[in-house]
Amino acid sequence: MRTLQKLTGLRLPEKTVFWLVLAVLVLMLAPMLLVAQYNVPCADDYHFGAPTHAAWQATHSLASVVQAACGKVAERYVNWQGTYSAMFLMALQPAVFGNGFYALVPFLTLGALAAGTCFFCLSLFTRLLGTGRWQALVLALVWLGIDTQLLPSAVQGFYWYNGAVFYTFFFGVQLFYFGVLARYLAAGQA
């Protein structure tokens, strides 16, 4: 935070800077989340979600839905490619349970991205590089702002479930993994 002080002449506590940056990020994300209510399934959502939707309509059993998702993965194993964990999640797209649930897609993907980014930054910067917690969180929020605002296609990255789960959600999961690696490396240095 000394750099901020040098650039602006302001001397703000790190916690205050965090809350200011968080407020800016919330303002940036608010329009993205407000339009989520208009989000509807499209394209591959129907293909991957058809068996699970049929299972839900017939039984209203989560076990049957998961079984249908596993069946979709098995079908793709024989006929297509090897992104099985992604295909399992694609078969569980929210509209399987009703079109109104599709509005949750940007919340799920942004949530995974935000959680992964914050965990990674906290792990890397505080555990491995020795910075303060508030500094690491400010870096995470700035990174999250850049990720969300400069994405080439917000529709494919946050709103279209199959694209968002395949890329954005798994990127968030990957950041968790890198955070665990950073913590592992930091524990080895002790």
Features from the language model and the residues they span:
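Membrane-interfacial loop-to-transmembrane alpha-helix junctions, especially the N-terminal start
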Residues: 14-19, 77, 128-140, 190
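Transmembrane alpha-helices of multi-pass, membrane-embedded glycan-processing enzymes
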Residues: 90-93, 105-117, 166, 170-173
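Membrane-interface micro-motifs in multi-pass membrane enzymes
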Residues: 44, 132-183
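Extracytoplasmic loop-helix module adjacent to an early transmembrane segment
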Residues: 30-80, 90-92
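Transmembrane-helix motifs of polytopic, lipid-linked glycan transferases
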Residues: 108-133, 176
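Start-transfer (signal-anchor) and selected internal transmembrane alpha helices
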Residues: 1-29
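Short hydrophobic alpha-helices at membrane interfaces in multi-pass membrane enzymes
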Residues: 183-190
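Short hydrophobic/aromatic helix or loop-helix immediately within or flanking a transmembrane segment
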Residues: 74-107
